[in-house]
């Protein structure tokens, strides 16, 4: 059937509100998303979407394609559901020419035929015509179809006028076998007795347009996870809480180089004299960086594309005067013609395991927040999919980056009883 989860802890306030046993489950939110993705668990944000998602899974299981259709007797509803679905991973396929002709014959010349379909109210009391209309739409065999219907309160007015549409959708469901959900705009517009009636006929009762669509996405994510290759066993154990520490860039690159990752030529120095001596080893442009800051740009602790020794001296003097290099300097080979920076990070999350972060690097990385997180170990297929999901994927030379990343032992399978040494804190 699949698993749906709501996990608190996105915001700082939510993290502070979790106490006792729930606090131990809050953990790192990015880590939770990565772990759920790995395990094929679909995460939703609201109780309404949680219940709607369970309803879809209960009546037919996960979705395996993103194709949907919608029927309503209001143009406003048709437009609204189209707008709500637009940012999601759902698709409204166009009707075929045959379907358009058949629906035009059923609904008349005044109704525009499109998906989502506004069938209007010309045939509202004609059960036979409604059945023909609904059946024709369901024949397209989209993964899930929605019929938007809002029912009046029984204590305020009669709902007998809705019976032709109810009987019509039940008949269309039986004749086509397609998956169909009756979707009410508001919770109070679909009573429990109506929901039970629809369920008895194999029709999914859902409430809330936005929530109904997001529940379809949740069911789709589960279906997609079932089709993925079997992932390696997770790298996780009950690690002791240890205070983290920051290695300087020079030491970090030494670690990377020792495990097979290519790094630029780099030297660390303490004085101007040592810097000028080390500079002789470099053949092209260099970068000068101050040691002692996790984020160098904020402290003016970096100077790029230095081509002359005089410019190098000026950059060093400026950093010394501003206190931008409290622990010395790094001189590094400047990489020419860099098209884009890729951020690769590793974090040990005690609640979820080791996380690999892939994303856009550079000075705007935290503003753009274009990252994907994976729990280790990972396969090349998982890395490819993560890179393709980035906003900058259009600019990535996928073969180059994938080869560079997957050739590193950092993302290869590792024994589950111990963590790679290069990401264990000292």
Regions inferred by a protein language model and the residue ranges of each:
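Structural motif
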Residues: 4, 118, 144-148, 181, ...
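Glycine-rich beta-alpha junction loops
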Residues: 7-12, 72-77, 98-99, 123, ...
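Active-site nucleotide/adenylate-binding loops and adjacent lid/helix of ATP-dependent enzymes
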Residues: 48, 55-66, 74, 97, ...
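Buried hydrophobic positions in well-ordered alpha/beta secondary-structure cores of metabolic enzymes
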Residues: 50, 70, 145-147, 212, ...
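Gly/Pro-rich active-site capping loops and adjacent beta-alpha segments
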Residues: 341-368, 372
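Low-acidity, Ser/Thr- and Arg-rich intrinsically disordered low-complexity segments
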Residues: 407-408, 413, 422
């Amino acid at each position: 059937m699949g698993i749906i989860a709501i996990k608190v802890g996105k915001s700082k306030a939510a993290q502070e509100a979790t106490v006792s046993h729930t606090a131990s489950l809050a953990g790192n939110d990015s880590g939770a998303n990565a772990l759920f993705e790995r395990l094929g668990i679909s995460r939703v944000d609201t109780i309404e979407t949680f219940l709607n998602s369970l309803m879809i899974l209960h009546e037919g299981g996960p979705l395996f394609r993103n194709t949907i259709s919608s029927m309503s007797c209001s143009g406003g509803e048709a437009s609204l559901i189209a707008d709500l679905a637009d940012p999601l991973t759902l698709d409204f396929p166009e009707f075929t020419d045959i379907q358009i002709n058949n629906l035009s014959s059923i609904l008349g010349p005044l109704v525009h035929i499109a998906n989502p379909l506004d069938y209007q109210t010309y045939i509202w009391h004609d059960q036979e015509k409604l059945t023909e209309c609904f059946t024709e739409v369901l024949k397209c065999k989209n993964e899930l179809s929605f019929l938007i219907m809002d029912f009046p309160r029984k204590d305020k007015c009669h709902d007998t006028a809705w019976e032709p549409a109810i009987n019509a959708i039940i008949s269309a469901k039986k004749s086509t076998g397609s998956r169909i959900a009756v979707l009410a705009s508001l919770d109070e517009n679909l009573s429990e007795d109506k929901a039970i009636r629809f369920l008895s006929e194999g029709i999914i009762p859902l409430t809330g347009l936005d929530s109904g669509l997001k529940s379809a996405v949740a069911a789709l994510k589960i279906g997609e996870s079932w089709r993925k290759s079997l992932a390696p066993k997770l790298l996780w154990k009950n690690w002791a809480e240890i205070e983290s520490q920051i290695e300087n860039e020079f030491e970090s690159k030494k670690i990377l180089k020792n495990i097979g990752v290519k790094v630029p030529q780099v030297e660390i120095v303490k004085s101007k004299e040592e810097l000028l001596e080390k500079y002789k080893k470099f053949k092209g442009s260099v970068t000068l960086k101050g040691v002692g800051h996790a984020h160098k740009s904020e402290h003016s602790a970096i100077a790029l594309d230095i081509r002359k020794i005089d410019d190098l001296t000026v950059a060093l003097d400026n950093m010394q005067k501003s206190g931008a290099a409290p622990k010395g300097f790094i001189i590094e080979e400047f990489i020419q013609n860099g098209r884009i920076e890729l951020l690769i990070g590793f974090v040990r999350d005690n609640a979820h395991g080791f996380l690999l972060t892939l994303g856009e690097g550079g000075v705007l990385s935290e503003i753009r927040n274009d990252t994907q997180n994976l729990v280790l170990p990972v396969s090349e297929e998982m890395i490819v999919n993560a890179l393709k999901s980035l906003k900058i994927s259009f600019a990535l030379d996928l073969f180059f980056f994938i080869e560079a990343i997957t050739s590193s032992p950092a993302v290869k399978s590792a024994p589950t009883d111990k963590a790679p040494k290069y990401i264990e804190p000292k």
